[in-house]
Regions:
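Short loop/helix-cap segments at secondary-structure boundaries that form the rim of catalytic
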Residues: 1, 25, 39-44
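Rossmann-fold NAD(P) dinucleotide-binding segment
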Residues: 2-33
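Short, solvent-exposed polar/charged micro-motifs at secondary-structure junctions
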Residues: 2-4, 138-141
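Fold-independent oxyanion-binding glycine-rich loops
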Residues: 10-12, 33-35, 52-53, 102
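Short glycine-rich, flexible loops that bind phosphorylated cofactors or substrates
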Residues: 15-17, 38-39, 57-58
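Preference for short coil/turn "hinge" residues that link or interrupt alpha-helices
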Residues: 17, 31, 35-36, 98-100, ...
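Adenosine-phosphate binding glycine-rich loop
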Residues: 41-140
Length: 141
């Protein structure tokens, strides 16, 4: 992991198993897709970005466990929206390890849909639907 800049966690675990990330390269990014792999101690030592603070701090996610441990959410630096709207920098420093925890983003749905659409175009399979909404709805928009 010392030379790895990006780690994506996508598992079905219910309790954290990663409690030490000292071997991860400085300035790396962890995509906390499955939300329960990282121990609270890892969350608390990293730069945390989330899609929705209220969503991510529930259901025994890693950020939720960190919140329970320290009694606040101050370890979450900002939301993805704050970064995309230039209200916050993407990174605090070049050496911090950043964790992105996307609870309500549907990131896996988006990734799968992109892959399916790409394969459909490449193989010439599938049916293109010109409009998603029924015609009466489309006229009112």
């Amino acid at each position: 992991l010392a030379e790895t800049e990006l780690v994506s966690l996508a598992t079905t675990v219910g309790t954290p198993y990663l409690t030490n990330i000292s071997s991860l390269s400085k300035g790396g990014t962890i995509l906390n897709i499955s939300l329960r792999d990282l121990g609270p101690e890892v969350i608390l030592q990293c730069d945390n970005v989330v899609d929705d603070v209220d969503h991510v701090c529930r259901a025994q996610t890693s950020p939720h466990l960190a919140e329970q441990q320290v009694g606040h959410r101050d370890f979450i630096r900002c939301s993805l929206a704050a970064i995309l709207s230039d209200k916050e920098p993407a990174r605090q420093t070049d050496t911090d390890i950043s964790i992105f925890s996307p609870f309500g983003l549907g990131i896996l749905d988006i990734a799968l849909a992109q892959m399916v659409a790409k394969l459909a175009v490449e193989t010439g399979k599938g049916v293109k639907i010109p409009a998603f909404l029924p015609e009466p709805w489309a006229k009112t928009l």
